[in-house]
């Protein structure tokens, strides 16, 4: 019986080695599949790193550039209106903005490009964390590109409505008569896609922190909506769920830019309809202390 012991030990050793080798092969196979998926969808890993962490620059100090710029300060020029003029101007601006509606029926009538240039210039006057101006406005006029954008968004939106959004969200949207069909993405003469830059780069290749980038770009979007209304154009705010990475790749934007909002821009079509919604009165949105 004793002479079999070394044989049994050898068999057990071989068995253990075989188990470990198969485990290694399985791990390599999974890694290979992950690499294949990453190669097929190159945007995924990078976009999952989207972060506005204010301490990131401290953790990876070698990759980030500290600001050493001295900004010259100049006297501030200001127009001080008489009180009656202030009241008049503030009232007129409110009345203009109160007419703004989310319009999903947009005609294909062309919009002067100079107007688009001006409204985006206006959006670019928004304040931003440490004056980093972390925004990119991508203007799309090409019909083929617009249609590709529509295909991506409608494909994801159908899944959103059917599975991701939940019964309550879908029910709340029913009264607004909205669904995953986005015809305006084809018909609107202009699409403006607003990207936030989670960080920037300086001349030496190091990263530059963009503080509060999402808040900064959101403010710019609000100013852009006001500028479009002032110019006599309509739009509807669109935040394509689960579409950002694919749209970023389609438009050739870098990985440090993340889609925040899409605005189809144009004139309302003749058959345009909007919900008869009422806005909250002042006493429900303002608190005086």
From Swiss-Prot:
The UniProt entry, under PANTHER family, shows: IODOTYROSINE DEIODINASE 1, NADPH NITROREDUCTASE
Task: Give the family from UniProt.
Answer: Belongs to the nitroreductase family.
Q: Where is the composition biased (Basic and acidic residues)?
A: 47-58
Function of the protein? Catalyzes the dehalogenation of halotyrosines such as 3-bromo-L-tyrosine, 3-chloro-L-tyrosine, 3-iodo-L-tyrosine and 3,5-diiodo-L-tyrosine. During thyroid hormone biosynthesis, facilitates iodide salvage by catalysing the oxidative NADPH-dependent deiodination of the halogenated by-products of thyroid hormone production, monoiodotyrosine (L-MIT) and diiodotyrosine (L-DIT). The scavanged iodide can then reenter the hormone-producing pathways. Acts more efficiently on 3-iodo-L-tyrosine than 3,5-diiodo-L-tyrosine.
Q: Which residues bind 3-iodo-L-tyrosine?
A: 130, 157, 161, 182
Topology relative to the lipid bilayer, per the entry, is:
Single-pass membrane protein
Region described as Disordered: 47-69
Q: Which SUPFAM superfamilies match?
A: FMN-dependent nitroreductase-like (SSF55469)
- Compositionally biased tracts (Acidic residues): 59-69
Chain's gene name: IYD
Protein source organism = Pongo abelii (Sumatran orangutan)
List the InterPro entries: Nitroreductase (IPR029479), Nitroreductase-like (IPR000415), Nitroreductase/BluB (IPR050627)
Q: Write the protein's name.
A: Iodotyrosine deiodinase 1
Which residues make up the binding site for FMN? 100-104, 128-129, 237-239, 279
Q: Which residues are involved in binding 3,5-diiodo-L-tyrosine? A: 130, 157, 161, 182
This protein's major location comes to membrane
Q: How does it assemble?
A: Homodimer.
């Amino acid at each position: 019986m004793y002479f079999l012991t070394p044989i049994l030990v050898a068999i057990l050793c071989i068995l253990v080695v075989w188990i470990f080798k198969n485990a290694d092969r399985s791990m390599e196979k999974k890694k290979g599949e992950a690499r294949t998926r990453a190669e097929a969808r190159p945007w995924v890993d990078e976009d999952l790193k989207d972060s506005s962490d204010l301490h990131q620059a401290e953790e990876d100090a070698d990759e980030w550039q500290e600001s050493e710029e001295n900004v010259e300060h100049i006297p501030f020029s200001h127009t001080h209106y008489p009180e009656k003029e202030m009241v008049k101007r503030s009232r007129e601006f409110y009345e203009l903005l109160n007419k703004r509606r989310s319009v999903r029926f947009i005609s294909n009538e062309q919009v002067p490009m100079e107007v688009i240039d001006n409204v985006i210039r206006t959006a670019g006057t928004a304040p931003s964390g440490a004056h980093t101006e972390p925004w990119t406005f991508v203007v799309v006029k090409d019909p083929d590109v617009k249609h590709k954008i529509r295909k991506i968004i409608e494909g994801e939106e159908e899944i959103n409505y059917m599975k991701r959004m939940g019964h309550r969200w879908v029910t709340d949207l029913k009264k607004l008569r909205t669904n995953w069909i986005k015809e305006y993405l084809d018909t609107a003469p202009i699409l403006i896609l607003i990207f936030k830059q989670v960080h920037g780069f300086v001349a030496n290749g190091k990263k530059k922190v963009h503080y509060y980038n999402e808040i900064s770009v959101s403010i710019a979007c609000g100013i852009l909506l006001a500028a479009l209304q002032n110019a006599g154009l309509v739009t509807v705010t669109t935040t394509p769920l689960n579409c950002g990475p694919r749209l970023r790749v389609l438009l050739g934007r870098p990985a440090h830019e993340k889609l925040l909002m899409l605005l189809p821009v144009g004139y309302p079509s003749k058959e345009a309809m909007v919900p008869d919604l009422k806005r909250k009165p002042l006493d429900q949105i303002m608190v005086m202390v």
